[in-house]
From Swiss-Prot:
<feature type="binding site">
    <location>
        <begin position="65"/>
        <end position="68"/>
    </location>
    <ligand>
        <name>FMN</name>
    </ligand>
</feature>
<feature type="binding site">
    <location>
        <begin position="14"/>
        <end position="17"/>
    </location>
    <ligand>
        <name>FMN</name>
    </ligand>
</feature>
<keyword id="KW-1003">Cell membrane</keyword>
<dbReference type="GO" id="GO:0050136">
    <property type="term" value="F:NADH:ubiquinone reductase (non-electrogenic) activity"/>
</dbReference>
<feature type="binding site">
    <location>
        <position position="8"/>
    </location>
    <ligand>
        <name>FMN</name>
    </ligand>
</feature>
<dbReference type="InterPro" id="IPR003680">
    <property type="entry name" value="Flavodoxin_fold"/>
</dbReference>
<comment type="subunit">
    <text>Homodimer. Interacts with KefC.</text>
</comment>
<dbReference type="InterPro" id="IPR046980">
    <property type="entry name" value="KefG/KefF"/>
</dbReference>
<dbReference type="GO" id="GO:0010181">
    <property type="term" value="F:FMN binding"/>
</dbReference>
<dbReference type="InterPro" id="IPR029039">
    <property type="entry name" value="Flavoprotein-like_sf"/>
</dbReference>
<comment type="similarity">
    <text>Belongs to the NAD(P)H dehydrogenase (quinone) family. KefF subfamily.</text>
</comment>
<keyword id="KW-0288">FMN</keyword>
<dbReference type="InterPro" id="IPR023948">
    <property type="entry name" value="K_H_efflux_KefF"/>
</dbReference>
<dbReference type="GO" id="GO:1901381">
    <property type="term" value="P:positive regulation of potassium ion transmembrane transport"/>
</dbReference>
<keyword id="KW-0472">Membrane</keyword>
<dbReference type="GO" id="GO:0009055">
    <property type="term" value="F:electron transfer activity"/>
</dbReference>
<protein>
    <recommendedName>
        <fullName>Glutathione-regulated potassium-efflux system ancillary protein KefF</fullName>
        <ecNumber>1.6.5.2</ecNumber>
    </recommendedName>
</protein>
Amino acid sequence: MILIIYAHPYPHHSHANKRMLEQAGTLENVEIRSLYHLYPDFNIDVAAEQEVLSRASLIVWQHPMQWYSVPPLLKLWMDKVLTHGWAYGHGGTALHGKHLLWAVTTGGGENHFAIGSHPGFDVLSQPLQATALYCGLKWLPPFAMHCTFICDDDTLQAQARQYKQRLLTWQEVNHG
């Protein structure tokens, strides 16, 4: 099962993430959990989140990039759900062998994240990749949609279809 952990503080403002979720939602064996819908008070049900994670083969962290990082509720979710003895540390093997895909949208262009005057995209992904590896997850190359503030609808739809294809290809290769 593909589990999409979706974290957008203002989902009604997001055209890119909406289209990504619409495309992903057409696939079989996909569950989408919208953190800001489930936990508007930031009171995360850790047991429920761990249970659904245990059923997933591919975990997707999907969100808009905010200040070169994840939205606050996704960070809190990581802190609360990825616990010692469950996700890492002695006895913490619940996520071992599962795959993780970082699916991120940005307002800036891809060149905005080039090495030089701005941190490179590879650098920005390091904390998430380190978290994944620490929990025994297999890190997959990220999926990024750039320039989402200025893209026309046709471009957003095309990129959302690429996202769906990425998930479908993973399912076909991994029988997930």
